[in-house]
Amino acid sequence: MRSDSVKNMSAYADQNHAPSLTDVRLELEIEREGIMAYQYADIIIDISHEKVDRPFQYRIPTQLAEEITAGTCVTVPFGKGNSLRTGYVVGMGNTAEYDPSRIKEIAGIAPGSMSVQSQLIRLAWWMRERYGATMNQTLKTVLPVKEKIKPREKKTLHCLLNQEELEAAILAAQKRHYKARVRLLEAFRDNLDIPMEFARRELDLTLAAIRPMEEQGQLSVKVSCEKRGLNHAKLPRPAGQTVRLNEEQQAAVDRFCEDYETGKRETYLIHGVTGSGKTEVYMELMARVLRDGKQVILLIPEISLTYQTVMRFYRRFGDQIAILNSRLSAGERYDQWERAARGEVSVMIGPRSALFAPFSNLGLILIDEEHEGAYKSETMPRYHAREVAAERARLSGASLVLGSATPSLESYLRAQNGEYVLLPLHHRAVAGSILPKVQIADMRAEMQVGNKSVFSRTLDAMLTERLARGEQAMLFMNRRGYSNFVSCRSCGKAVTCPHCDVSLTLHGKNRLVCHYCGYTIPLMKQCPSCGSPYIAGFGAGTQKMEEFTKIRFPDARILRMDADTTAKKGGHEAILEAFANREADILIGTQMIVKGHDFPGVTLVGILAADLSLNTPDYRSAERTFQLLTQAAGRAGRAGKPGDVVIQTYRPEHYAVQAAAAQNYELFYSHEINYRRLLHYPPVCQMAAVYFACGDEAVLDECAEMAARRLRESAECIGPVPAPVYKVNDIYRKILYIKCEKCAILDQIRGQIETLAAADTKWQAVQIQYDIS
């Protein structure tokens, strides 16, 4: 039986509310001063299986009563063999659920673990209910560091002798031929503190030589924790406010501060054109909240979290900041979390994982480039950082600020409906800086005049001109979301599903499949739209583009930035720094070159194969294409110089391409939201994907169809259909798409599937995951 605390949690979760401090009897306070000692703890065991996705009650040893709180990572005896397992405390109390003599005792606190706050435990519970994950999966998500990391210790040998005693000790050691001891004592003449590493490596000392000197009172060993990662001594000192805000920026700051100072905690959407100075606004909002002693989380997509970006915040806030990114080692990440947990920093900057920073006095969460797909987790729990940030802000009484030049349709619709406060920035921040002039190059017309080059005539001429003037250019390969679709080189149209309006995917060499409804046709030899024989799968790569550009412009200095060239630690920074220092004329890359970078020397951006992402089998393909093209175009003309952009496409008439060329978000939004309403896609409805996986194909088919029949009684269902990769490691996979009006219905759907699974033993072999759009 569950403890009262977990029962109460379940009751609140059923009403789509996270448990509150007043209504849930968890006693989850972090500070131990004056708090009663509990006898029992409810613990989730660190085993990823639904059958143990419940708390187990353990007795708290008297000697650990003051150390264990909600969120503490502990080791406990588990199962018939009482093998030691890791678990997380999710509740505490003084009432035994069954015979106290049968309740096992906590073995100890896990080495190197940090106690997460009660707020994060409640957030994990909310994520469990929202995304259909196990409590163990959500707890692992909110815990600071997955690996058990030890602090890096720095040991120093400190001399305890005065000068006279030191000389006498040297003479005594020389007489007894203690050569190693003599080397160390002589080193103490110049420095009373010798790093242990230096003593062992340079002086060739062993612990056997050091211990007797310590026992005789000649030296002591000082131990300190050494921070891994950034060398704060080399960072720029904070300079305070250095940028004067324009009227639009100041209006956005004033609106936020007015609400903040009156106690209103809202969600704000800063919609600013590329180069409008959203970062300066973020820093002003952060400064206001920090003045009250509050803490701030700033989420930035991993791809944009470059040295250049980080330094902008260090110049303003100094070492109040901790940074997270995937290029940090596990030890470096551990140190950053420890700094946050101890209150040594007030700002955590990083990708979506930074959302779970152990801040107890959170005042503001900012999400830069809130439209980015990187904020959606692709593993369980399949959460979206924007949704989880809203819940964490609610739990902590913090404000939430979203920012983007190309907001997600979900966020912009909420702003239009009054759920978010819209803060527009219509103009570029730098005086005299204007949006670039954009031209669309129709690649169908290029082919008709015999130009089979990857460069249109317009882009070729502009590149030649820029190189002659000593200016820089960026060539962007739009490969985000690339899949093996089929398109016509003559008319530019991709082969789409007649039922779902998404591109068909090429399977093998001769079969086209829709991954939404399962529609299948053989690969045709002629374009169904224009009859042209020039129809085939589409493929492109940055490496081939680099080779072609070097042949076409042999004197140009060229850099390439993609997954291959940035694989090593520091690879991003090295390439971006070289380009910023004018060590190259042309930078070629995928979306990582267009994410928030500011290069004053760039006056031309060429976007190659702009419609690649239009042809992905996803109802969001037009939205993602518009976002990428707009972000890429925004890199040109940022330092007062006029900028040009050339968009090369086989579908110049598409509204996403036209709106991106016009840098007009409202134009795109009006078209796209009508499309979503027409086909009943989010954000005008709620949509979920239920993933079924099983090693027995027949069982998979039967169970997936059984679920679809049951769910069609209460919701619109599409499928089940084979997953894009149907078989992985001998496991077959199918997807069932569900559309409904409210999130509450999705919660009921999970309950219905669980009821089905509990009633039939066939389901024991089927794994189920949920993905909420």
What are these regions (language model features)?
Residues 2-404, 416-430, 706, 737, ...:
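Accessory, non-ATPase domains that flank or precede helicase/AAA+ motor cores in DNA-metabolism machines
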Residues 36, 51, 69, 177, ...:
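Short coil/turn motifs at beta-sheet boundaries
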Residues 38-40, 53, 82, 470, ...:
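A general secondary-structure signal for short beta-strands and their flanking turns/coil
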Residues 112, 678, 724-726:
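Outer-membrane beta-barrel proteins
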Residues 240-246, 250, 254, 264-701, ...:
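Inter-lobe coupling/hinge segments of SF2-like helicase ATPases
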Residues 559, 714-723, 764-772:
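Short beta-strand elements
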Residues 707-743, 749:
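C-terminal structured "cap/appendage" subdomains that terminate the fold
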